[in-house]
Swiss-Prot record:
Residues 35-45 have a biased composition (Low complexity). This is Long chronological lifespan protein 2. Residues 32-59 are annotated as: Disordered. InterPro entries: LCL2 (IPR034543). CDD domains: LCL2-like (cd23996). Belongs to the LCL2 family. Residues 1-20 form the signal peptide. Keywords: Signal. Probable component of the endoplasmic reticulum-associated degradation (ERAD) pathway. It comes from Neurospora crassa (strain ATCC 24698 / 74-OR23-1A / CBS 708.71 / DSM 1257 / FGSC 987). PANTHER family: LONG CHRONOLOGICAL LIFESPAN PROTEIN 2 (PTHR38425:SF1).
């Protein structure tokens, strides 16, 4: 009987450090995200930050901005910039995209993708000539 008591006491003593070490692992693996959410809520509340809801998945915000934009020339649909011609539209993310003008006044924005300056435009030109 004494041996059984010692075994149970040993198991209970070891259970606490195991739960502390692997508790979050088991929570994440089996869907118990309560502890993580509580921590995030405490962090947001503790620093005076409020958690904002995600942007809705409908286009109403964009459409409202588009309708409010005043432009007597051409209003670029992706940046809402007012320009003289469609191919003058800027890229939405100029630090990360190169602009390439295509035939018939069209333009595209291509990810720079870590290439050196002008490399994306060079590849587009090669593709246009059928060399890529």
């Amino acid at each position: 009987m004494r041996t059984l008591y010692l075994v149970l006491l040993s198991l209970l003593t070891l259970a606490s450090p195991i739960a502390a070490q692997f508790g979050s692992f088991f929570d994440q693996m089996f869907g118990g995200h309560g502890h993580q959410q509580t921590q995030q809520q405490q962090q947001h509340q503790g620093h005076g930050h409020q958690q904002h809801p995600n942007v809705p998945s409908d286009p109403s915000i964009y459409q409202a901005n588009y309708q409010r934009a005043h432009c007597d020339k051409y209003l670029c649909p992706d940046t809402l910039a007012c320009v003289h011609y469609p191919h003058h539209c800027p890229c939405p993310w100029p630090l990360h995209e190169d602009k390439a003008e295509l035939a018939e006044g069209q333009r595209i924005c291509v990810s720079k993708g870590g290439f050196k300056a002008g490399e994306a435009a060079r590849k587009i030109e090669l593709a246009r000539k059928g060399m890529l």
